[in-house]
């Protein structure tokens, strides 16, 4: 019940894209020591977890020292049981006040994120060796592509008077894209009230389709955070993670595949050139023909999220990059 989070606020909405409210989930916030013990017993030697911005800075410029102490305790617990803590500073959710200011399409996001990062690093930096600034930093641009594909697919189905069970319209997170498209208008109207947005402004959270400018702002925020961390702790290992499909070209699809790799990965290279590492999250492959992405192959194993179960995609993505 992270009540200052944009995700929590949207879970409570009548017209929501979330399948169900998270409530206490597995209550890791209070049971982290039990969970860390199980990780150690299972042979893990590191634990990547997130610091929740909305808990740390519930109101703009007002930081909660008790929450930063909570995360200090989690880090100490990792050390106690032999796990290397790796902190992620942003994992999808943001404070509600960030969204009210325009979210991840507002130029102010760069300075706001930097200020939050400085607070965290000045309190926790001496206890850490690895920091991931932003999880799946390409998510908003990837979301825009998925939504565009879904719209085109829906238009084609109406034109052909056919139905389709799946195409490459699945996003690699727990959001129901089909439901989002169907509820979009009502959701935006309700969300404007929830976040006190002016007429015409949409909710630009990390789960929303991003513009090219918004994509650039994420990279600016990452670079500002990285530089602030390095200024204070030069030896800190800093990077981000990207959600990458394993794009595979069908005959004639080579040019389209290269365009997708440019969009999903290569255009970020200048922004991450000074990073110490890159994290890769891969969930599936995507078959690409001359006209774009193809549906999941008939007979393929499908995950609960609706995309093809294809473990080899991680290896092939790493080889590609």
At which residue positions do the language-model features occur?
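Non-catalytic scaffold segments within catalytic domains of secreted glycoside hydrolases
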Residues: 1-30, 36, 40-45, 56-319
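Juxtamembrane transmembrane-helix termini
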Residues: 49-54
